[in-house]
């Protein structure tokens, strides 16, 4: 039996700012639906991925910023670095290790506890 991860909720306080950030790093906005004043659903998918993230308002009881880790995989770290830099994404470091990048949040502040949006 195959099990595939489809969608992961990422709680945020500022949906528009978070959406702009994810689009800036290359995610595609598949859906952006305001169901009501209290509920908005935004689904974003990284290029080539079968799994998406969901940001929005009224989607989860998780505290905004409480998801403190997300990993993505790329075939070529140098190409990914150049692509992000070309998109104007500021990186806090070129590499933490041979296979990782450290994107800087939109505010320029690093935060392990809470996302700036």
Residues covered by each model-derived region:
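Short hydrophobic/aromatic beta-strand micro-patches
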Residues: 9-11, 71-75
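Core segments of cupin and vicinal oxygen chelate
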Residues: 2-3, 9-51, 86
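Vicinal oxygen chelate
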Residues: 32-33, 42, 72, 81-117
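Short, solvent-exposed beta-strand edge segments and adjacent coil->beta transition regions
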Residues: 2-7, 65-69
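Short, conserved charged micro-motifs
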Residues: 17, 77-81
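Conserved short beta-strand elements that form part of the metal-binding/catalytic scaffold
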Residues: 28-67, 74, 93, 113
């Amino acid at each position: 039996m195959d099990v595939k991860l489809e969608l992961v909720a990422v709680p945020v306080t500022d949906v528009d700012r978070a959406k702009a950030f994810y689009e800036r790093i290359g995610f595609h906005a598949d859906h952006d639906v305001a169901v009501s004043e209290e509920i908005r659903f935004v689904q974003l998918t990284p290029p080539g991925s079968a799994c998406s993230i969901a940001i929005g308002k009224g989607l989860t009881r998780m505290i905004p910023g409480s998801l403190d880790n997300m990993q993505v995989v790329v075939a070529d770290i140098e190409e990914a670095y150049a692509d992000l830099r070309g998109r104007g994404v500021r990186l806090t470091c070129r590499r933490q290790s041979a296979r990782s990048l450290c994107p800087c949040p939109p505010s320029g502040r690093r935060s392990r506890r809470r996302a700036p949006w």
